[in-house]
Amino acid sequence: GPYGQPINLAIDYLLANTQQSGFISAPRAASHGPMYGHGFSVLFLAECYGMSPRAELREALSRGVKLIVDTQNREGGWRYYPQRADADISVTVCQVMALRAARNAGLHVPKETIDRSIQYVKQCQNADGGFMYQLGGGPSAFARSAAAVVALNSAGLYDTPEIRKALDYLAQCLAKPAASQPYYEYGHYYAVQAMWQAGGEAWARWFPAVRDEMTRSQRDDGSWSASIDADYATAMHAIVLQVPNNVLPIFQR
């Protein structure tokens, strides 16, 4: 396709930064939470593998998946670094989505790993339907609650009491401007997937409002701004707005 070359360059970059352990991380670019980068890298490679079954791609994927499986902690989740320490729901969801994409691409993912991770996510749900950051208590918030719904969907849970409560919670966050929502782009990256899977009235209410808010905030040069980085913001907005096209396997109903 027209974007084959840049996608292959991105694949080459990730393969070059895959360590022997399977950990995908570029030391010079690593943040304080490199397991985020690892999870999203595995997700990206898994999506590419279905269209470009390069042998070295499968090898990196297999090692990346093994690292995720091997570093799951006793609670069933993951944290910022590839070690069995504590866990939080945000990093955990990132790994769950990577494992789901890898499984969809034909790689083996132990059922026990998925079951334990989903149990962790469920245990993080608050009475208001939203999700706390870590086990032990804490308030609900938009971004991590949207992420939690997507993780539950990935395990085949679509119409359960947990999902219904969570969707009701997310509906209260509808189309709030970026300035009033921490992690706005990250939250909407997951929220659009949650609402797309919910379909029906939930999707009919959510997407037009978010689409209109996002198109209004687009800058004249086609980009979006964010406190983190304009490239990141633009990529996230583009992903959100194209979900109804049903192109990427991980987003498909």
Report each predicted region and the residues it spans.
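Predominantly the C-terminal beta-signal and adjacent terminal strand-loop region
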Residues: 215-219
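Eukaryotic helix-linker segments that join adjacent hydrophobic helices
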Residues: 11-18
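An alpha-helical repeat/solenoid feature that recognizes helix-turn-helix modules
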Residues: 1-6, 19-66, 70-115, 123-209, ...
